[in-house]
């Protein structure tokens, strides 16, 4: 029987905001970015992006049957745990990344205690283990808006049933602290916590708008350091300054657009689509790596939305400090639009993103969600995939 491979070529237009119900450690000190975000002299404005999947050179994915978005995976003993969007944050477990994966319950006992956004099914969980306890950082928001918040729950066990929801640690758009820089111009979703070798913990977050940011956490890991006393030490990690697609608000004649105290729109960005999100920091000596998803994450039923070359792909920058600056191979700062593409669409792999890094006895693993183009472009059909990483001259390369 002949097997027909349908090649999808990249070139057109997409939406200006992420549409989804979902997700997603050692350092020196750096300096804070205290200025509003503006394109700099080294800013890259991308008119077109990467070659067709056929010419990508990316390896095939280790595909699985676990349907997920923005997974967070940890390994405890011989068991893998995956935390992802779903009622009260869904937990799956398996004895192999390849599966089979079994749903074992929910992380929270009900809705998030944060009274914002989609409380019933928080997005982008990021689970870590430190000091004998598991911490799961999560987001609540609404699609296309930055009226968002990040919360945290903790437990002595990785499975369901024993978690305490500590609630809000940081928010943007509306609410206490949302008028503090850079929360007054960013989107507090897609949390990722990186713990330094000296025990210092950093919260990385951000989606669209002004990109990815970092703030330090207190030692107890459930409070942002300096937020209450005006000494917040925020660092700008990465951004997409170029208008990758036109905003729906650009020609809007609507008389009212919800804005923050600084005038920054809360729902929709009239400056256009700046598709960068899903930051994940990892360390592989001697560098710190800032991974992120670039492009459109979801809703590809319309062929025009999947043929324009602006779908998700996984990019990275590196630094000698967890506080940056992070640069790509050309030395371009991620804040100026830099970023090295490590994995993207190829074969039946479409729009990989929402990534994380897992380290086992054999090395580093890049895991992510993706759409299998031979099966479906439906949002609900996104599934877990992964690839091993090799490092060439200090730069990660995806291999099968």
From Swiss-Prot:
Residues of this chain annotated as glycosylated in UniProt: 24, 184, 372
Listed GO biological process terms: arabinan catabolic process; pectin catabolic process; xylan catabolic process
Recorded metabolic or biological pathway in which this protein acts: Glycan metabolism; L-arabinan degradation
A GO term from the CC aspect: extracellular region
Pfam families to which the protein is assigned, alphabetical: Glyco_hydro_43
Keyword set includes Transcription: no
Signal peptide extent: 1-16
Keywords for this protein: Carbohydrate metabolism, Glycoprotein, Glycosidase, Hydrolase, Polysaccharide degradation, Secreted, Signal, Xylan degradation
UniProt keyword Secreted present: yes
Site (Important for catalytic activity, responsible for pKa modulation of the active site Glu and correct orientation of both the proton donor and substrate) location in chain: 190
Subcellular location: Secreted
Reactions accelerated catalytically: Endohydrolysis of (1->5)-alpha-arabinofuranosidic linkages in (1->5)-arabinans
Active site: 70 (proton acceptor), 277 (proton donor)
EC number: 3.2.1.99
Predominant cellular place of this UniProt entry's protein: secreted
Molecular function as annotated in GO: arabinan endo-1,5-alpha-L-arabinosidase activity
Family, as annotated: Belongs to the glycosyl hydrolase 43 family.
Record function comment: Endo-1,5-alpha-L-arabinanase involved in degradation of pectin. Its preferred substrate is linear 1,5-alpha-L-arabinan.
Protein name: Arabinan endo-1,5-alpha-L-arabinosidase B
Organismal lineage: Eukaryota, Fungi, Dikarya, Ascomycota, Pezizomycotina
Gene: abnB
């Amino acid at each position: 029987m002949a097997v027909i491979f349908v090649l999808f070529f990249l070139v057109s237009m997409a939406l200006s905001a992420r549409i989804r119900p979902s997700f997603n450690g050692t350092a020196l000190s750096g300096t804070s970015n205290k200025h509003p975000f503006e394109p700099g002299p080294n800013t890259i404005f991308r008119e077109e992006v990467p070659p067709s999947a056929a010419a990508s050179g990316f390896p095939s994915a280790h595909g699985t049957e676990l349907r997920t978005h923005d997974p967070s995976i940890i390994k405890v003993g011989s068991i893998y745990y995956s935390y992802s969007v779903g009622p009260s944050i869904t937990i799956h477990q398996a004895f192999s990344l390849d599966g089979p994966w079994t749903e074992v319950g929910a992380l929270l006992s009900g809705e998030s205690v944060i009274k914002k956004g989609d409380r019933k099914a928080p997005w982008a969980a990021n689970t870590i283990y430190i000091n004998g306890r598991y911490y799961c950082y999560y987001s609540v928001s609404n699609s296309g808006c930055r009226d968002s918040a990040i919360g945290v729950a903790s437990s002595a066990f990785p499975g369901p049933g024993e978690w305490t929801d500590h609630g809000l640690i940081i928010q943007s758009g509306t609410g206490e602290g949302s008028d503090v820089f850079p929360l007054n111009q960013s989107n507090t979703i897609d949390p990722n916590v990186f713990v330094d070798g000296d025990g210092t913990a950093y919260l990385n977050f951000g989606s669209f708008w002004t990109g990815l940011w970092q703030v330090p956490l207190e030692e107890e890991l459930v409070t942002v350091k300096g937020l209450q006393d005006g000494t917040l030490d925020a660092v700008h990690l990465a951004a997409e300054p170029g208008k990758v697609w036109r905003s729906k608000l650009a020609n809007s004649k609507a008389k009212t657009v919800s804005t923050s105290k600084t005038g920054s729109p809360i729902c929709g960005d009239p400056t256009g689509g700046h598709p960068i999100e899903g930051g994940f920091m990892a360390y592989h000596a001697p560098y710190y790596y800032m991974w992120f998803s670039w492009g459109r994450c979801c809703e590809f039923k319309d062929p025009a939305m999947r043929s324009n070359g602006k779908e998700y792909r996984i990019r990275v920058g590196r630094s000698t400090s967890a506080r940056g600056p992070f640069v790509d191979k050309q030395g371009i700062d991620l804040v100026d639009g830099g970023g090295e593409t490590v994995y993207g669409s190829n074969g039946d792999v479409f729009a990989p993103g929402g990534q994380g890094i897992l380290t086992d006895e054999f090395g580093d693993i890049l895991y992510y969600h993706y759409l299998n183009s031979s099966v479906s472009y439906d949002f609900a059909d996104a599934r877990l995939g992964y690839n091993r990483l090799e490092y060439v001259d200090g730069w990660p390369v995806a291999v099968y």
